[in-house]
């Protein structure tokens, strides 16, 4: 069909509409998917939507946004990235708490978001209970939680859980779904 007929661009085509419908069914959430070209773009768009330039983003010291994305998240969001040392690539409330200061002080970056990778860059996986503990703490401090789901299908398989059970049900605010590493030909979705 795509090579034989005309389709409107900019999301007004049957393929985009079908993808949006499937995403909403999968997550059973009122969400507005944004399709982007690659993982860095997905993370940057997600973090831009969640933060303001005077804020900071907390992440594991091994996190993709800190180690591998060539400073794009810092450049595009204006936020400071605050790496947190972890023994296994996973953040915990106990590891996050020491970074929860400076709120209301114009001389300090205000913690605005927590970034998680599922699976982590070290191959570890967050359980729903671990995710809920992090999102609860973050939300208590008015912060949002972003999940980089470049390899989330592996976490779903390892834990035998659905995408919804590892995101929406755990309080994750924004997911960057990695299409390429999760079985699609190309592209990502916020």
Predicted ranges, named:
Residues 1-190:
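Conserved PLP-enzyme active-site core in the AAT-like
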């Amino acid at each position: 069909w795509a090579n034989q007929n005309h389709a409107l661009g900019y999301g007004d085509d049957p393929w985009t509409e079908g993808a949006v419908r499937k995403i909403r069914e999968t997550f059973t959430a009122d969400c507005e998917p944004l399709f982007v070209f690659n993982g860095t773009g997905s993370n940057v768009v997600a973090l831009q939507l969640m933060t303001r330039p005077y804020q900071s983003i907390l992440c594991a010291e091994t996190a993709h946004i800190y180690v591998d994305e060539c400073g794009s998240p810092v450049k595009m969001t204006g936020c400071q990235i605050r790496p947190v040392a972890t023994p296994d690539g996973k953040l915990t409330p106990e590891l996050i708490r020491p970074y929860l200061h400076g709120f209301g002080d114009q001389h300090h970056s205000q913690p605005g978001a927590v970034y998680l990778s599922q699976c982590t860059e070290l191959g570890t996986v967050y359980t729903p209970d671990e995710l809920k503990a992090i999102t609860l703490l973050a939300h208590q401090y008015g912060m949002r939680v972003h999940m980089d789901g470049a390899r989330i299908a592996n976490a779903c398989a390892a834990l035998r859980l659905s995408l919804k059970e590892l995101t929406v049900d755990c309080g994750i605010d924004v997911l960057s779904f990695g299409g390429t590493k999760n079985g699609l030909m190309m592209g990502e979705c916020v």
